[in-house]
Curated annotation (Swiss-Prot):
It is found in: Cytoplasm, Nucleoid. This is Nucleoid-associated protein YejK. The lineage of its organism: Bacteria, Pseudomonadati, Pseudomonadota, Gammaproteobacteria, Enterobacterales. GO terms for molecular function: double-stranded DNA binding; single-stranded RNA binding. Keywords: Cytoplasm.
């Protein structure tokens, strides 16, 4: 992985009681040793693979102001990180999920793009076997489950300040409160809505195939084509490019997909991140509620699966063998 650390700082927040988070600040930066580089590379990999929310700095953002000064050389990185950790403590203390942790600030470069990553990492206990085959306790950073993480694309921020996607953060397992916390700490407002962009793309694709008067099989083939392209972009860590997608759909209609989307006013960006859960709707129907979970390939609708909107009834012809076996055993047993 072509990742180069420029500067990295580590501090700690210790929860002493319900109201107080104690600051433990380092007096020096971390050295970018091989172990440190491996840790940052793993954090970068894990973070890049997760669904993120997008934002941009507000004009009053204190973090943005001090970061800009640091980038201009008016403040060193260690002082910036120490002051930011103090503000982080003040914001985090407002929320009941505040458990403290190790606060990481890392300025690094990956594939010619500069990033500032801010993360609160937890220390977990585990076991290890030593050279004498004794089992001893040990601790490790829980990078895979880190959910208090934000990253600023410094290159995008400085070269395209009007962008709405240079700042990203995770919403976390505890829901909106983590997102709210990061918005407050970063002094940011919500930017690009990737999920809305993906929903708009799906609607545009359906309308595009309808206007082209494709039959059912042809329309499903186009949906599969769109899904394959978008999924490839997702797996590669790349964004959906409308122009590239339009080339994939050349021949579907006399009008290009990009021209169709622009003329119909779908307000799609030229490129935007893929959202896995939304894109799945191109090839599958899924839903759950009231003790019922249903998931099936879209091509089965109208062939083996039929929906009557008047009665809201779903009819399935030919159940899966394992389900049929369970039903037969239950009914034959009289239970």
């Amino acid at each position: 992985m072509s990742l180069d650390i420029n500067q990295i700082a580590l501090h700690q927040l210790i929860k002493r009681d319900e109201q107080n988070l104690e600051l433990v600040l380092r007096d020096s930066l971390l050295e970018p040793t091989e172990t440190v580089v491996e840790m940052v590379a793993e954090l970068h990999r894990v973070y890049s693979a997760k669904n993120k929310a997008y934002g941009l700095f507000s004009e009053e953002s204190e973090l943005a102001q001090t970061l800009r000064l640091q980038r201009q050389g008016e403040e060193d990185f260690l002082a910036f990180s120490r002051a930011a950790t103090g503000r982080l403590r003040d914001e985090l203390a407002k929320y009941p999920f505040a458990d403290g942790g190790f606060v990481l600030f890392c300025h690094y470069r990956y594939l010619a793009v500069e990033y500032l990553l801010v993360a609160v990492l937890s220390n977990l206990s585990s076991m290890r076997v030593n050279e004498n085959l004794d089992i001893n306790p040990t601790h490790y950073l829980d990078i895979n489950h880190a959910d208090i993480v934000a990253r600023i694309d410094l290159t995008e921020w400085e070269t395209n300040p009007e962008s709405t996607r240079y700042l990203t953060f995770l919403k976390g397992r505890v829901g909106r409160k983590v997102a709210d916390f990061f918005m407050d700490f970063l002094g940011a407002s919500e930017g690009l809505n990737a999920k809305a962009q993906n929903r708009g793309l799906l609607q545009a694709v359906d309308d595009f195939t309808a206007e082209a008067q494709l039959d059912k099989a042809e329309r499903q083939n186009v949906r599969q084509q769109v899904y394959s392209y978008c999924n490839e972009q997702l797996q590669a860590g790349e964004e959906i490019e409308l122009e590239s997608l339009s080339k994939e759909l050349a021949g579907v209609s006399e009008v290009s997909f990009t021209k169709f989307a622009a003329e119909k006013g779908y307000e799609l960006e030229e490129s935007f991140p893929a959202d896995r859960s939304t894109l799945r709707q191109l090839t599958k129907f899924a839903g759950s509620g009231g003790g019922l979970t249903i998931n099936f390939d879209a091509m089965l609708l109208g062939e083996r699966i039929f929906w009557d909107p008047a009665t809201d009834t779903l009819t399935i012809k030919g159940t899966p063998p394992n389900l049929r076996d369970q039903l037969q055993r239950r009914t034959s047993g009289g239970n």
